[in-house]
């Protein structure tokens, strides 16, 4: 959700000085004034914890916010007044909501689309091509937001997204739909990233956690609204309105951003044309893009369209490893012109927030995918009703995300919430993995709510970490890295869960119902399960199906636990100034 760290990270750097408490933004301003006569490189960072404050000589930890002239954001900057901020927030929220809606609205429309285009074999592409292009260009947009005006890069990304949506809605063929989804994915990769950057330039740091949580919570709203809107459009109007709705939202966003958001100057001067081209690390991208496409295709196809041991999947993995290895070497040589600089990789706040985001988002997507499958297969409900039965988790995520954002602004620190999120979500995930066919509402409502509360505590925190702990000059690239890793986490976790589900289902069927055609059962899907299984074998098949789903839940639980590893390195930095 997007688009998330924590312990008392006490650095071991030499020549450190000890302080007695965590530092605030104003404390750092005072320190900066006192040392203004000294020559201090802006890339050095002051590491703080509840018990210590250190200034390491290396640049692995970038200086937190609070400085003005040395490249970090200063909270003394002017922000839009209340009514301008309200208009900007409406525009940003509509853009993020339509982008998130595009991930969920298509599911209930696919049967009608495949009937019209007679394109059942293309269904996999409808779902995979959008996140594929979205993930690949996120880091590129990080560079664009660094060297060009935030307003115009954002509006350009929005325009590409809306063009893709219009192509999807107007296309006369399945191929056109796939192309439109790919174009929309390209644009969406700059929308969420740009929305977070607009927030960082429009909202004071202390209030940013709440606003970030509000925007992030829209993913949960889209998770509920998407299938319902998709079903309504498909049944009462046309499936094409699943895509035509996006330009309506986009027009409002474009108008509000044009009128009310000041066009910020580029964070870095792009220089002349030749210098601009060199800053975009074209050599690195030449290896990165095909490497990521190979990896994501292998994760999408493995265990589904093709066996994991097939030559196609193995070839894709080998290709991705080779290309991404070359990309890493290129990044090492490119230094500050790299797509992912060594300074970013070494910064504990960046890699900690990225790892946390990878795990917590991965866990969320596993349960978002398999809880509706459990309701449809085990409880024998429709796709629409399964979405409603999934509300306890989604409402827990939305409400607790907003509450945690408010809490961070009040107490000043995001790290306690990042510690709590893996613990609470792991407990909830563990309870969800005990699901049985005879479980009633008290169990599936309560367990989902607990898990959703845990997720809500942490989902928005990685972006807050970046906004609070990273210099202004590096914020676009840092948010791009965290967002990119988030997308990758969802692809990896769902791929693992699908493989676990498939293997456990095959094992369970062989043990409980060997006469059932396993391949036919898997391709039938959860909603038609009872039509392809003989009545006398249904109970045994449901036992195997329930076991397969709960084993997939184990993957989500494991990702929740692993999120704590990402929380531990995060520095304790207050988002509050001195009152």
Swiss-Prot record:
Task: Output a single Gene Ontology CC term carried by this record.
Answer: plasma membrane
Q: Which residues cross the membrane?
A: 85-105, 121-141, 159-179, 183-203, 214-234, 241-261, 282-302, 310-330, 355-375, 388-408, 411-431, 439-459, 479-501, 553-573
Free-text disruption phenotype from the record: Abolishes the production of 15-deoxyoxalicine B and accumulates decaturin C and 5-deoxyoxalicine A.
Q: Which residues form the signal peptide?
A: none
Q: Where is the composition biased (Polar residues)?
A: 1-24, 36-54
Q: Write out the biased-composition intervals (Basic and acidic residues).
A: 25-35
Q: Where is it localised? A: Peroxisome membrane
The glycosylation sites annotated in the UniProt record are: 45, 380
Record membrane topology? Multi-pass membrane protein
Fetch the InterPro entries from UniProt: MFS, MFS_dom, MFS_trans_sf
Alphabetical keyword list:
Glycoprotein, Membrane, Peroxisome, Transmembrane, Transmembrane helix, Transport
Primary subcellular site in the record, as a coarse category: membrane
Instruction: Cite the Pfam families for this sequence.
Output: MFS_1 (PF07690)
Its domain of life reads Eukaryota
A single GO molecular function, which one? Answer: transmembrane transporter activity
Q: Which stretches does the entry tag as region Disordered? A: 1-75
Disulfides per UniProt: none
Function comment: MFS-type transporter; part of the gene cluster that mediates the biosynthesis of 15-deoxyoxalicine B. The first step of the pathway is the synthesis of nicotinyl-CoA from nicotinic acid by the nicotinic acid-CoA ligase olcI. Nicotinyl-CoA is then a substrate of polyketide synthase olcA to produce 4-hydroxy-6-(3-pyridinyl)-2H-pyran-2-one (HPPO) which is further prenylated by the polyprenyl transferase olcH to yield geranylgeranyl-HPPO. Geranylgeranyl pyrophosphate is provided by the cluster-specific geranylgeranyl pyrophosphate synthase olcC.
Q: Which family does it belong to?
A: Belongs to the major facilitator superfamily. TCR/Tet family.
Also noted in the record is: The 15-deoxyoxalicine B cluster is a rare cluster that contains its own geranylgeranyl pyrophosphate synthase (olcC), in contrast to other related clusters which rely on a FPP/GGPP synthase localized outside of the cluster.
What protein name applies here? MFS-type transporter olcL
Record lineage: Eukaryota, Fungi, Dikarya, Ascomycota, Pezizomycotina
